[in-house]
Amino acid sequence: MKTFVAKPETVKRDWYVVDAEGKTLGRLASEIASRLRGKHKAEYTPHVDTGDYIIVINAEKVAVTGNKAKNKVYYRHSEFPGGLKSITFEKLIDRKPEMALELAVKGMLPRGPLGRAMYRKLKVYAGAEHNHVAQQPQVLDI
């Protein structure tokens, strides 16, 4: 019996919508990353993008445990001397609510072209509305 290898042109991708309200950031992000990779499917192949599209709504209401709202810090650098910027989770949620979940999921995906293709299938919205009604997404309870 030969080993099955999924072909990119034969992969069937579904659309799912996830409500992030009250969910813990890391636990939600790990499940989303797993589904973006396609690990929940029987035809999962590591070098082929077999994952589904994931729409996340209410990203502004995602929760973190303990004191992480005040203590968790996100860093970025402009590549110029003295260009290190930092922002806490609390301020990040106020300014760009989608960004915290996007960064958490992106860190759980592989690096390189395949990981970028998987990341492009993630759609995150701060509020309860999304503009992917035409794709008829199924509700995914995580």
Swiss-Prot record:
Keyword match Isomerase: no
Molecular function in Gene Ontology: mRNA binding; structural constituent of ribosome
Any Pfam family hit: Ribosomal_L13
Gene Ontology CC entries for this record: cytosolic large ribosomal subunit
Alphabetic keyword roster: Ribonucleoprotein, Ribosomal protein
InterPro entries reported for this sequence: Ribosomal_uL13 (IPR005822), Ribosomal_uL13_bac-type (IPR005823), Ribosomal_uL13_CS (IPR023563), Ribosomal_uL13_sf (IPR036899)
Keyword Nucleotide-binding on entry: no
Protein's GO biological process: negative regulation of translation; translation
PROSITE patterns linked: RIBOSOMAL_L13
Protein function: This protein is one of the early assembly proteins of the 50S ribosomal subunit, although it is not seen to bind rRNA by itself. It is important during the early stages of 50S assembly.
Xref: NCBIfam families: rplM_bact
Family: Belongs to the universal ribosomal protein uL13 family.
Subunit structure: Part of the 50S ribosomal subunit.
Protein name per UniProt: Large ribosomal subunit protein uL13
Organism: Vibrio campbellii (strain ATCC BAA-1116)
Gene designation: rplM
